[in-house]
Amino acid sequence: MFFFKEYKAKKVKAPDNFSNRERIMASKNKNLIFLLNKRFSWMKKYIKGKKTIIELGSGNGCIKKIIDGKKIILTDITKYPWIDKKVDMMKINLGKKYLKKVDVFIINHSLHHCANPALTLEKMSIYLKKNGYVLINEPETSFFLKLIQVLLDDESWSLKAKVFSRKNIFNPKSPWVSNTAVAQLLFKDNKKFQKHFPQYKIEKNKLSEFTVFLNSGGVNSSFFHIKLNWFFLKILNIFD
């Protein structure tokens, strides 16, 4: 099964962003903080000195746990109290104010929930400044991720999806429907990506986390973890 091209979760699981945000912002869990640092600290050099930074699909807004001093505009399809602007990733109607004015777009584990990721990339380029950045964290459809998704019936994947077609790759009936293979399909072949998106250049594409996430205690849900101190988290990170 884990070598199959597709897997469809039996139901769509919508996390409780209110309770998850409260838990994350108040958390002193070193495992979780270490994970969030891995996801966001690398972005700091790209946003340093930048004026307009917009995160798409912010969800519980956990980026502010790590990068709080910087004015990052949080957007989401749902207007939670901590969200600055309601934005649908498939439309990105930011208005004339932001045309060619955005220094940095941030997408953290939300692109695979977008039914038309190619269209999203296209629309971002309309607002992005020359030499601007799109910073992305996304799942990699590895053997172990597939195993976890099947065991937990957590999310779906499809390596058959035509992500460059500018057409919906799944029914966007809920913002939590997903295809965790999206980033792999978009970015694994640099030449193919460049052909479809000549306005972009992939500067860096690398794997980042595995066991650090599995033992974090959870971002969009809370789960069992073994508490570790910074020393052992750094050791674990070496093997990641």
Question: Residue spans of the language-model regions?
Answer:
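A short glycine-rich, Lys/Arg-flanked "PGG" loop and its adjoining helix->strand segment in the class I
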Residues: 119-133
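Conserved N-terminal segment of class I S-adenosyl-L-methionine
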Residues: 1-100
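A conserved beta-strand element that flanks and buttresses the S-adenosyl-L-methionine
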Residues: 106
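Acceptor-substrate binding/catalytic loop of class I
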Residues: 173-190
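A C-terminal cap/extension of S-adenosyl-L-methionine-dependent methyltransferases
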Residues: 191, 195-198, 202-240
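Conserved class I S-adenosyl-L-methionine
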Residues: 135-168
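Short catalytic micro-motifs in class I SAM-dependent methyltransferases
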Residues: 109-110
